[in-house]
């Protein structure tokens, strides 16, 4: 699929070439330089769900005319662009409005299969506590959301099923340098026994949100839990060792072959 460019750009370029090649530009003025630039910009939200087109006309590094699809018409940026704005609005307005589809949408659909536009990377979500846990003392929970693409993401905090909006702060979106992003969303809180905090993450790569829970508990409860886990691990190790020894003992010692086989 061939990429499209705004047709009005070709007309403007022809006009500039005609001006620069006219007899008045030769002779004593030949050392002067005139630079005309055109910038066609397409902005996309959620794929092609919302598209914005902006055309910028620049003469000698100064923008003098602009078309913004959100405005719907040409607007002069400087006095130099006023005659062109009036003329283009009369002659080319409908054509330029249509380029939202004929240029922006067309080019998006043509290149998305060959670029990262369709890339989706699911985020990894981890909750951590900024300081050693102590019940009934002020603390901060940190929800680390990493390695996701595209950049659009929504992270919320819940306490016992109710969304928390007070005490929530976030870092700026951080680029990892490999087209993926990360962000930290903090919640200032005072943990109390039995409370459940949830980091809720929504992202285009997910069919359903990711939810990660953190439960407030005392140091003694944490120690008992860790002791229980350690005991279970040791139990599994000793059980496996016992089964291995039993299996070896059931085989019995290997003796010499029957005498008849040696003859």
From Swiss-Prot:
What are the boundaries of the region Beta-2?
121-214
Look up the signal peptide feature and give its range.
1-27
Tree of life domain:
Eukaryota
Q: Give the region (Beta-1) as residue ranges.
A: 28-120
Domain annotation Ig-like C1-type: ranges:
123-211
- Which residues lie toward the Extracellular compartment? 28-224
Q: Which residues cross the membrane?
A: 225-245
- Summarize what the UniProt record says about post-translational modification: Ubiquitinated in immature dendritic cells leading to down-regulation of MHC class II.
Annotated GO MF terms: peptide antigen binding
| Intrachain S-S bonds | 42-104, 143-199
Q: List every stretch annotated Connecting peptide.
A: 215-224
**Cellular component aspect of the GO annotation:** early endosome; external side of plasma membrane; Golgi apparatus; membrane; MHC class II protein complex; multivesicular body; plasma membrane
Q: Name one GO biological process term.
A: antigen processing and presentation
Question: Which residues are exposed on the Cytoplasmic face of the membrane?
Answer: 246-263
Q: Which residues are glycosylated?
A: 46
CDD domains (alphabetical): IgC1_MHC_II_beta_HLA-DQ_I-A
Q: Which residues form a coiled coil?
A: none
Q: Which keywords does UniProt give here? A: Adaptive immunity, Disulfide bond, Glycoprotein, Immunity, Membrane, MHC II, Signal, Transmembrane, Transmembrane helix, Ubl conjugation
Family named by the database record: Belongs to the MHC class II family.
Name it. H-2 class II histocompatibility antigen, A-S beta chain
Classification from the root reads: Eukaryota, Metazoa, Chordata, Craniata, Vertebrata
């Amino acid at each position: 699929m061939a990429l499209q460019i705004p047709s009005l750009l070709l007309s403007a370029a022809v006009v500039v070439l005609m001006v620069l090649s006219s007899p008045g530009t030769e002779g004593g003025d030949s050392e002067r330089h005139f630079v005309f630039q055109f910038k066609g910009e397409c902005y996309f939200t959620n794929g092609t769900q919302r598209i914005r087109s902006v055309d910028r006309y620049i003469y000698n590094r100064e923008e003098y005319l602009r078309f913004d699809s959100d405005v719907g018409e040409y607007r002069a940026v400087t006095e130099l662009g006023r005659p062109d704005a009036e003329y283009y609005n009369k002659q080319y307005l409908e054509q330029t409005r249509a380029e939202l589809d004929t240029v922006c949408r067309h080019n998006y659909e043509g290149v998305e299969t060959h670029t990262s536009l369709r890339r989706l990377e699911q985020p990894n979500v981890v909750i951590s506590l900024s300081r050693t846990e102590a019940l009934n003392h002020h603390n901060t929970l940190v929800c680390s959301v990493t390695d996701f693409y595209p950049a659009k993401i929504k992270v919320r905090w819940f306490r016992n099923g109710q969304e928390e909006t007070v005490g929530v702060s976030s870092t700026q979106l951080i680029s990892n340098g490999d087209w993926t992003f990360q962000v930290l969303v903090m919640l200032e809180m005072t943990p109390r026994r039995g409370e459940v905090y949830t980091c809720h993450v929504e992202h285009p790569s997910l069919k359903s949100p990711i939810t990660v829970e953190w439960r407030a508990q005392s140091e003694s409860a944490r120690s008992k839990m860790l002791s229980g886990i350690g005991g279970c691990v040791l139990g599994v190790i000793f059980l496996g060792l016992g089964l291995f020894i039993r299996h070896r003992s059931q085989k019995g010692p290997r003796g010499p072959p029957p005498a008849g086989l040696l003859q």
